[in-house]
Regions:
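Conserved helicase motor core of P-loop NTPases
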Residues: 1-140
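C-terminal accessory regions
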Residues: 118-250
Length: 251
């Protein structure tokens, strides 16, 4: 599929027809009628438009019955960087050494023992479970400012990770990836180009190559119902270490 995108004559409808044909014979490619909400808990739906991302995140939280003012254990997050003054370079390096770099996939485990701290599972890290000062931002449709249920004065910043833009997904990979095709169709209809290539082709290439083993090409604006409540049972649970800012920093 990625190779096919190099054909200058290939249109969006032709590409979708190829996906549909391949899906009939190859279980690694799925022509999907809806976004699978269970998958979003550990592998974000990939979208082009920011509005789609925010809408899917809020739909995800809604079907799981997540309260507006707090996170449920098991909700996915994406690290959006470290918000620390330059003088605290060592603390920044400590956080980054534990895997909290921009774009890192994280699962929320619960509130930490100290105000502003969250217990987190950093996906792929050697010691994945930590407690860190956190600034967690939940964006909502038609609201300019995100809601911040957990905010330390400084620390690691996070966005919700149930959906992410394809641009932000560059450099990341997941076993199974869901691509929200209506967004790519919109990009194709607009006729936009990027670096001399149709934008939809660049988006499609990045999106499908994020998948390590399975691709779901979602063609309808629908969301499945969860098969179970959000939980953290799939994560290896250990006592998280405190990755704290120095005590004087918090005063």
């Amino acid at each position: 599929l990625a190779h096919a995108l190099g054909d200058p004559e290939l249109g969006f409808e032709d590409f979708e027809a190829q996906i549909r044909d391949i899906s009939a014979n190859d279980e690694r490619v799925v022509w999907a009628q809806r976004v699978e909400v269970d998958l979003m808990a550990r592998s974000p739906a990939l979208v082009w438009r920011n509005a789609t991302r925010i809408r899917l995140i809020n739909a995800f939280r809604s079907v799981y019955g997540a309260p507006e003012n707090e996170l449920l254990p098991g909700e996915p997050l994406i690290c959006d960087g470290i918000e620390l003054p330059v003088k605290h370079r060592k603390k920044r390096l400590d956080l980054e050494a534990r895997g909290l770099i921009k774009g890192a996939q994280v699962v929320y485990l619960g509130a930490g023992r100290r105000t502003g701290f969250s217990r987190l599972h950093v996906v792929g890290a050697e010691e994945p479970q930590i407690s860190a000062a956190s600034i967690i931002k939940i964006e909502r449709p038609d609201e300019e400012e995100p809601f911040i249920p957990y905010a330390a004065n400084m620390g690691a910043a996070f966005l919700h990770g149930a959906a992410v833009t394809i641009h932000k997904a560059q450099g990341s990979q997941w076993g199974t990836v869901q691509v929200f095709a209506p967004d790519l169709f919109a990009a194709a209809r607009m006729g936009r180009s990027e670096a001399g290539q149709p934008l939809w082709k660049r988006l499609a290439y990045v999106a499908i190559t994020r998948a390590q083993s399975r691709l779901l090409w979602v063609v309808r604006n629908r969301l499945s119902k969860p098969t179970d409540a959000l939980n953290t049972e799939d994560l290896k649970m250990v006592v998280p270490s405190d990755l704290a800012l120095d005590q004087e920093l918090e005063q």
